[in-house]
UniProtKB/Swiss-Prot annotation:
GO MF: ATP binding; magnesium ion binding; shikimate kinase activity
Name this polypeptide is given: Shikimate kinase
Annotated gene: aroK
Cited SUPFAM superfamilies: P-loop containing nucleoside triphosphate hydrolases
Entry cofactors: Mg(2+)
Keywords for this protein: Amino-acid biosynthesis, Aromatic amino acid biosynthesis, ATP-binding, Cytoplasm, Kinase, Magnesium, Metal-binding, Nucleotide-binding, Transferase
Organism: Caldicellulosiruptor bescii (strain ATCC BAA-1888 / DSM 6725 / KCTC 15123 / Z-1320)
Amino acid sequence: MKNIVLTGFMGSGKTTIGKLIAEKLDIELIDTDSEVIKEFGMTIDKIFEVHGEKKFREVETKVIERVSKLENVVISTGGGVVLNPENVKLLRENGVIYFLYAPAESILKRLKDDDTRPLLKNGDKLSNIIRLLNMRMPFYKNCDFEINTDILTPELAAEKIISIHLAKESKR
């Protein structure tokens, strides 16, 4: 089975939905942010502070190179992984990419008490979310499928992705 790759903005539900899919299909979940944290031995917040976003993205791509070679896994990516076309190419070689979408206001509600997001640290959170979401949307729209996590519970979103994925797999 091709990998199920979840991408989308921070707070869109990638980790939560990824866990549900992995559990239901009894396959492994790989969270690329967690893999980057292992590489550096520090939180993403700290990585950005000490090494900067550029270094974070370089290591993220190395993680993508490694995990994209796996088969039959769920891969939950960082929200900015789609900004690098090479990452998308690698993930698509052995996977189907699902964009988990939620509007800016919903993301703000989900992240309101989360101070660990380096890209939302300075200035007005909603303005930053809108700006980043608008900048990334053309990249997200290039994914294979879009799932609106604002109108679906995590359980229903997971079921929808599984249903789409298994139908797609049966046609291969």
